[in-house]
């Protein structure tokens, strides 16, 4: 399973990218607004740091508005993926953009039907929201398993980006369910490679080594 960073904090992306395990980045209007910087400038800077897909979301509501925005965003960098909301107008936009060879990430998916519709429209990625589904008592892992089964059974090319990840348990859970990708907030990313027992073990090793050298 691939790891994407769900942030637009360029300094954090640069710091974590050096680990060699960041496969892409996702953003949305909320995340971009926190940075207080020009949208295009931020996306271009991220694309210079990360080689993998970088999702940048449209803000238009009609098909024509989304397609116009998407065509412009797609010009910014070869690894830009245009994020489109799961709506009737969004599906129409994805269908058109797919014909033009523009990569898309259909976001805010909460049902199998929505995911399948996005696949049929030609979405490059589909993003089911794990945390938000759990908030309403829905089994998000079952959704991801079902979507992966549909992709494999019918031969769709879409990849699943598990979004709304709120902790290590979500990352591990979606990996077990067959998500192709988990997009993870930068604040959660450290949990992928840290553990108190690891720290304690290192401390013990160093203490024992120091005692050995003093003999």
Swiss-Prot record:
Function statement: Transaldolase is important for the balance of metabolites in the pentose-phosphate pathway.
Q: Does the keyword Nuclease apply?
A: no
Protein family per UniProt = Belongs to the transaldolase family. Type 3B subfamily.
Kindly state which keywords UniProt assigns to this record, in alphabetical order. Cytoplasm, Pentose shunt, Schiff base, Transferase
Q: What pathway is it annotated to?
A: Carbohydrate degradation; pentose phosphate pathway; D-glyceraldehyde 3-phosphate and beta-D-fructose 6-phosphate from D-ribose 5-phosphate and D-xylulose 5-phosphate (non-oxidative stage): step 2/3
Give the superkingdom in one word. Bacteria
- Which Gene Ontology MF annotations are present? aldehyde-lyase activity; transaldolase activity
The record's subcellular locations are: Cytoplasm
Q: Which CDD domains match?
A: Transaldolase_FSA
Q: Which residues form the active site?
A: 83 (schiff-base intermediate with substrate)
Q: In its UniProt record, which GO terms are filed under biological process?
A: carbohydrate metabolic process; pentose-phosphate shunt
Gene3D superfamilies in the record, alphabetically?
Answer: Aldolase class I
The EC number of this protein is: 2.2.1.2
Query: Predominant location of this chain?
Result: cytoplasm
Could you tell me what this protein is called?
Answer: Probable transaldolase
Q: Which reaction does it catalyse?
A: D-sedoheptulose 7-phosphate + D-glyceraldehyde 3-phosphate = D-erythrose 4-phosphate + beta-D-fructose 6-phosphate
Q: Which InterPro entries match?
A: Aldolase_TIM, TAL/FSA, Transaldolase_3B, Transaldolase_3B/F6P_aldolase, Transaldolase_AS, TSA/FSA_arc/bac
For this record, the Gene Ontology CC terms, alphabetical, are: cytoplasm
Any Pfam family the entry gives? TAL_FSA
Which organism is this entry from? Streptococcus agalactiae serotype V (strain ATCC BAA-611 / 2603 V/R)
